[in-house]
């Protein structure tokens, strides 16, 4: 058996077809936008004028109205990412649809990828831990454990094995690199 035949069989076994693979790209963009929307909406609800982009939200004045707004705005992004994963876990529980799985998987993957490869100290979770004066990795660990549990539950419902998760990881890496490249192009 050739390697290409092995991969084709693995993808079929993992229920990954072209539709599922292509869904990952818009899911990646929408996940980034939803995460940033979490920051933006919290800031706006607290009365701050916020500026929104694909991979960043900041105040128009560069200062929040209240010092505590920093913390709440920082929590908004990870909270919305967890909310996304929970909502689509519920959809998976109801529909058992493989087409929904990328939304749950990418929510977990994007926080893991950002924390590990994006420079930990630049991430929301590190900033939140510092503001709460808890261990540097505490909030990141909490967020990642919640998302891991949701991804694990979704994988179990859909009977996806570790090999399938590996293929979704590859698709997620490709998708996240497309988002990062797009952000760099539009941020010039």
Please report, for each region that a protein language model flagged, where it lies by residue.
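Alpha-helical transmembrane segments and their helix-start/interface "positive-inside/aromatic belt" motifs
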Residues: 13-29, 98, 167-170
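Small-residue-rich helix-interface/hinge motifs
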Residues: 21-71
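Short acidic DE-rich linear segments
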Residues: 186-188
């Amino acid at each position: 058996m050739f390697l290409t035949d092995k991969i084709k069989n693995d993808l079929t076994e993992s229920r990954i077809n072209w539709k599922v693979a292509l869904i990952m790209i818009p899911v990646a963009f929408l996940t980034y936008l939803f995460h940033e929307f979490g920051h933006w909406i919290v800031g706006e609800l607290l009365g701050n004028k916020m500026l929104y982009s694909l991979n960043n939200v900041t105040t128009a004045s560069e200062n929040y109205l209240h010092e505590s707004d920093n913390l709440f705005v920082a929590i908004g992004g990870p909270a919305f990412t967890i909310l996304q994963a929970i909502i689509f876990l519920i959809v998976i529980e109801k529909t058992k649809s493989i087409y929904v799985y990328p939304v749950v998987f990418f929510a977990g993957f994007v926080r893991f990828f950002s924390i590990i490869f994006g420079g930990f100290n630049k991430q929301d979770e590190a900033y939140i831990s510092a503001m709460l004066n808890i261990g540097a990795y505490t909030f990141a660990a909490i967020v990642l454990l919640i998302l891991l549990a949701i991804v694990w539950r979704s994988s179990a419902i859909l009977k996806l094995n570790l090999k399938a998760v590996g293929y979704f990881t590859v698709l997620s890496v490709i998708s996240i690199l497309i988002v990062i490249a797009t952000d760099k192009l539009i941020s010039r």
